[in-house]
Amino acid sequence: MKIAWTPDLTVARYLWALARDDRNWGGDDPPGVVYFYAPGRHGEHAETFLSGFNGILQIDGYPGYNRLARPSRKGGDPIVVAHCWAHARRKLKEIFDRDGSEIAAEGLHQITEIYAIEKDIRGTSPGQRLSARQARSAPLVAAFGTWLHAQRGRVSPKSRLGEKLAYIANHWDGLQTFLTDGRVEIDSNNVENLVRPIALNRKNALFAGHDEGGAAWGRLASLVETCKINNVEPFAYLKSTHEAIAAGHPKSRIDDLLPWNFQPSS
């Protein structure tokens, strides 16, 4: 998420959002989000933030993440990438809304069928989700892949539709990751929803003003938005937490002050 650094907008900085939300499959870990402040959008920033993380990362199509999946990745093993079907759908929707393309309409219909299965299995265990996806979703995804290949052979790669189809094809491996692990979501909408409050807040807090201000913005936003997704009232949490720190809350028990552990006083 781009944030302005100076009033004349000649310099820009970014907040990168990293989120965890296992509620759709009944995970035990509470949801949370952290906004990392960085002076740019280059892939090395993501590499730094994710140093030590090994696993599956749900992302959009931004190419800066590509280095994370390479054997040469710094800070850990190559990350398994799960790409976002909502972004794939959005590409076709843009074409359909503009041109009324029948090809785009057919692609949208196929994606809608895949999403219908996700609606059916939301809230079930990872094993149940995986079984349903392998039995029901995998054939639909395979059919979409066949359809995608056929349309790319018919449509000029330089056309608007051709460019959108190429985008989907370029991310095809990552679009299939959700078929192999029941914990993986079909899209990255959860984290995108957590970026939206930052974008809205820019209208009220137009400028970070300084690198330290940007970093502080990210830290405070991390606490506030994590409160909100855990149904914790942010002001009550911040007030109680500051009071606890002022009263000498021990650093050895810092986890007690995380938003999901907050217990409001009666």
Where are these regions (language model features)?
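Catalytic center-proximal scaffold of phosphoryl-transfer enzymes
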Residues: M1-S266
